């Protein structure tokens, strides 16, 4: 319709053409944080965090309670997000990875629809041929280039061209050195059950929350730019928190805290403000959803499924299952290998640890904080239980996430849940087969997909 309108309306002013294009093809804006636990946002229940911009944004759109990603690490997550493909399927499943040559990304899918596509901030995807953004401006000293964001939007508006803008913050990824720590009183924090309550734990969390607040201000700046450029009403805006923070039981794990993400979508005139959706959606669904909103179809097969109909209110449900994996081979201070696979059905999370005989380790287990936890474990039962659970895991785990969101009580040994395990195991194996995931053999090939490990 848009092309036909333009072809018969060549006499109209550029301003009128621009307006018509924006109405039929909304601008697409996605802001993604870096290592931010969804439960550390006020609108997702945090009583300690200070996230006024995100919380207010949630009153303007729909807040998804069950948004998940396929990997609890930045690089595979972002490849998954920008390609609409499962990590093993695209080749981008370890950390610091790259997609297979010939893979198509959101840029390829939106270009034929007339969109200009930009990425401002953290990249963490490769190669360039797979991600040929029209504009890429990296962060400087960990901070976003807001001038570049405003210029990109203004240029597209002037040309009457719809745009897709990804804004990728570096916060609150460690080191936690941004934001105002004085806003938070360590002694008044409410600690999640997996944390060992020592002064250093509380100090680290205050630094993390200060950086969450810093990220919230960045998001607020982006929203302000949309208003200043008068494109907010013609833009679909998505906020994502990415995987959980780097404290134990979140990032680098397939526990719910590792792969459960905040997802809030504002679409003026379409999405009901202040609404909440329990539809199960995944990062892999973003590309087909964006392409669907833009009025087209992906140029080639993608693994994700559009949830536009959920946004428009035509459907309340989306998926029955979400799937995730963790490849620890090659991570910073990681083990030789420790592969994890997981399936989730909206209530129960099933986890398979491919090599339970190995010790799980990462950058967190090498920190003074975790070492203090281990030292305390010699005399403190909770510290002993948490440090052991984090590093020594059984072959299978099952959690009732609805009643145990932090995955503390493993139900796998209870015969009452045998049928649930059988069902989720079958779904997980079906997904792995569809992705070409051969389990431990795939784990051992991780270096083949990490440029830094190739000779």
Give the label of every model feature segment:
Residues 2-5, 16-397, 405-433, 437-455:
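Formylglycine-dependent sulfatase
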Residues 6-11:
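Sec-dependent N-terminal signal peptides
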């Amino acid at each position: 319709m848009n092309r036909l309108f333009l072809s018969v309306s060549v006499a109209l002013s550029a301003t009128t053409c621009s307006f018509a294009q924006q109405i039929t093809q909304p601008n697409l804006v996605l802001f993604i944080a870096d290592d931010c636990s969804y439960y550390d946002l006020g609108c997702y229940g945090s009583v300690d965090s200070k996230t006024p911009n995100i919380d207010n944004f949630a009153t303007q759109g729909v807040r998804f309670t069950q948004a998940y990603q396929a990997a609890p690490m930045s690089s595979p997550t972002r490849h998954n997000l920008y390609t609409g493909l499962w990590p093993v399927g695209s080749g981008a499943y370890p950390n610091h990875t790259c997609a297979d040559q010939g893979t198509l990304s959101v840029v390829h899918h939106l270009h034929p629809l007339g969109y200009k596509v930009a990425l401002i901030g953290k990249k963490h995807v490769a190669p360039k041929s797979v991600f040929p953004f029209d504009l890429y401006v990296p962060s400087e000293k960990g901070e976003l280039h807001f001038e570049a964001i405003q210029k990109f939007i203004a240029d597209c508006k002037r040309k009457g061209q719809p745009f897709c803008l990804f804004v990728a913050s570096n916060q609150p990824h460690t080191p936690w050195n941004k934001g105002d720590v004085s806003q938070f009183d360590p002694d008044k924090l409410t600690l999640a059950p997996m944390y060992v309550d020592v002064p250093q734990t509380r100090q680290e969390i205050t630094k993390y929350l200060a950086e969450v607040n810093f990220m919230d201000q960045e998001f607020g700046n982006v929203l302000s730019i949309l208003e200043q450029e008068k494109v907010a009403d013609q833009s679909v805006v998505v906020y994502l928190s990415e995987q959980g923070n780097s404290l134990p039981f979140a990032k680098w794990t397939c526990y719910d805290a590792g792969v459960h993400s905040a997802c809030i979508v504002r679409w003026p005139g379409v999405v009901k403000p202040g609404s909440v959706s329990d539809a199960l959606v995944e990062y892999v669904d973003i590309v087909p959803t964006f392409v669907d909103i833009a009025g087209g179809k992906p140029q080639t097969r993608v693994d994700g499924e559009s949830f536009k109909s959920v946004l428009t209110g035509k459907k309340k449900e989306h998926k029955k299952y979400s799937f995730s994996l963790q490849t620890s081979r090659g991570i910073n201070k990681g083990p030789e290998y420790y592969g994890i696979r997981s399936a989730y059905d909206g209530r129960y999370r099933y986890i398979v640890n491919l090599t339970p005989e190995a010790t799980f380790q990462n950058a967190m287990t090498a920190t003074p904080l975790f070492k203090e936890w281990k030292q305390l474990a010699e005399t403190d039962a909770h510290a002993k239980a948490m440090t052991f659970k984090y590093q020594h895991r059984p072959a299978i785990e099952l959690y009732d996430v609805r009643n145990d969101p932090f995955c503390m009580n493993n139900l796998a040994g209870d015969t009452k849940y045998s049928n649930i395990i059988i069902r989720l195991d079958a779904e997980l194996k079906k997904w792995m087969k569809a992705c070409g995931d051969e389990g431990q053999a795939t784990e051992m090939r991780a270096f083949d997909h990490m440029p830094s490990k190739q000779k």
